[in-house]
Amino acid sequence: MAATQYYGTGRRKTSTARVFAKVGTGNIIVNKLPLDEYFGRETSRMVVRQPLELVEMTDKLDIMVTVKGGGNTGQAGAIRHGITRALMELDESLRPSLRAAGFVTRDARKVERKKVGLRKARRKPQFSKR
């Protein structure tokens, strides 16, 4: 691989994203599809672009992503986390601004397991007094 390529692994819920960034024109490719084709929702696309817009590198880097597992929200969050890590590898001075925006911290929230005797993770069966 070329030395001008920067790598970051991002995770969110059950999704894992491998992000490769290199100097380019601003193309974002996710699983061999353009970002706009891969994510139907504008919200997901916005989440993916957030770290690039923060450091004003939207049209300076080409980003290639392979993402596995989870759904749309988890994958978008994982890609954002991976892009953030790749940006920090590119330039460590970006870390404070990315940290302040909350992109560096891995979102540790996961789906809570269903418990025995309950209908869902916390939802109890309906109580009948009589």
UniProtKB/Swiss-Prot annotation:
Q: What Gene3D superfamilies does the annotation carry? A: 3.30.230.10
State any GO CC term. cytosolic small ribosomal subunit
Q: Which cysteines are joined by disulfide bonds?
A: none
GO molecular function terms listed in the Swiss-Prot or TrEMBL record? RNA binding; structural constituent of ribosome
- UniProt KW keywords: Ribonucleoprotein, Ribosomal protein
PROSITE patterns recorded for this chain?
Answer: RIBOSOMAL_S9 (PS00360)
Pfam families associated with the record: Ribosomal_S9 (PF00380)
* Stored SUPFAM superfamilies: Ribosomal protein S5 domain 2-like (SSF54211)
Name the GO terms of the biological process aspect: translation
Does the keyword GTP-binding feature in the UniProt annotation?
no
Give the highest taxon in the source lineage.
Bacteria
NCBIfam families membership:
PRK00132.1
Which HAMAP family has this protein been placed in? Ribosomal_uS9_B
Similarity-based family = Belongs to the universal ribosomal protein uS9 family.
**Under what name is this protein listed?**
Small ribosomal subunit protein uS9
Q: What species does this protein belong to?
A: Shewanella halifaxensis (strain HAW-EB4)
